[in-house]
Amino acid sequence: MKKLGGNLRTTEFLKECLADALIKLLKEKPIEKITIPEIAKLSSVGRTTYFRNFTSKNEMLTFKLVQLWERWAEDQDLRERKNFSLNNALSFFQFNYSIKNLLELIYERNLQNVVYDAFYIVMMPQLGINVLECYKSRFYSYGLFGLLDEWIKRGFYESPEEMTEFVNHIV
């Protein structure tokens, strides 16, 4: 996914700068009132970078969530980061608890769809995987989103360990 005019690392860094600026602005006002020029100015990244890499502000938030997951999974040395299993359920809930403030902001602004979109990107198998794997990934994406959605709405009342116990009882 190399972009013309720059290497992938630089592009990813600039995309993340844009997403970080959007998150800062979301703390002040709803996404509908945030303009691309505002995001570009705050991030010190040109508007063309936005238009070259994103189709919407929501897509920037989804990108940021995926980046945070990839970075966290790398730091935790997770082997199963593109696939959900009972073995990595605790890691999943620990990760989401670690970005609790961001998730609460996303929900406060009624943008929970970006959380599901990030799940889908992370969990959807690559092309060529058999049909059962596709259905399994979709099943876990929706199921986990439902659990996370409820956990966020309940104010992260339960611990990541308790949430993992719920998953073990449900599945």
Q: What do the PLM-derived regions correspond to, one by one?
A:
Residues N7, K82-S85, E108, E133-K136, ...:
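Residue-level recognition of alpha-helical structural elements
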Residues Y107-F145, E161, H169:
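Amphipathic alpha-helical packing segments from all-alpha helical-bundle domains
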Residues M1-T11:
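N-terminal intrinsically disordered/low-complexity leader segments
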Residues T62, E108, K153:
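Phosphate-coordinating loops and pocket residues in cytosolic domains that bind phosphorylated ligands
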Residues E12-I23, K27, E32-K33, E38-S44, ...:
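An amphipathic alpha-helix adjacent to DNA-recognition modules
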